[in-house]
């Protein structure tokens, strides 16, 4: 009996080793990212192996385990990419940062790029003219300006004609300012919604006839902040949450037309969305000019002054390597079977997972330690209240 059990256990070990090698080879060859679904399946297979080995003493358990492994292996996506040549893609927000990098990246791949910029005479636009090929066309595009959107639509329509537009990458976005939600002026909330959400809707609605004609791709650059609350991101996160849900609904609506929709949720990348010290100072002054006197008194100017430190810290802990985002956007545009959701970057999946599946106190403590470690100061009224309690 012991010999049979040893032979059975050895069979499971051999099969597991063989299966692991085959899976690793297929994952590497097809550049498949190990994300939550893949990890869950692998853990399930491990538990199934233990169960089959312990409960079934016959070949039935072995056959069940082999069948499960085979199903998992077949389910691993094969990286089949479409050719980039001849495809036309519109990218918004190409003046700097991620949009600028995307314009260069897809131009090098041979895509006909329409790079939308706020300033055609700006430094970013000039660099794109200098380093990119004649395939790239610079266009003046403010996503909040309906007139500019219509002008760009007419230009693109005349060029692509019956072929249609293969892809739109909604990259244009603003952060506004990081501060307690009560402190943010309504103007910042409106700016975030206008650019990050309403602008995307306006451009999408205008270009959908061309996108449907090509049975192309709609790609939105959202954010991990659209899935989980982060202290100080009230305006930005609300706009990205709206964008995330818009993308999810459009995926359902456009499926019947053959248009595939993908949402990319980057986390921890260094782009110009954080702004500069001059912008932080301007926004800080805007906050001071707009908050009510009693609110300013409750928070205290020493607390308000730490807000600029928050921007500086966030801009220094991010990664300047944008390649994970570029590769994911490329997959969304050119893969035969694109994913709906991509999560490149540090903690892009971990943070939403903690928020959804763990007790709120676990996530709240994690968020506090991760995003506010340098802010060891309370608002003035809370400090005074604590001092009074200690005296009592």
Language-model regions, residue ranges each:
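Active-site helix of classical SDR
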Residues: 204, 239-242
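Residue(s) in the substrate-gating loop at a strand-loop-helix junction
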Residues: 223
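Canonical Rossmann dinucleotide-binding motif of NAD(H)/NADP(H)-dependent dehydrogenases/reductases
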Residues: 72-114
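SDR active-site lid
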Residues: 256-339
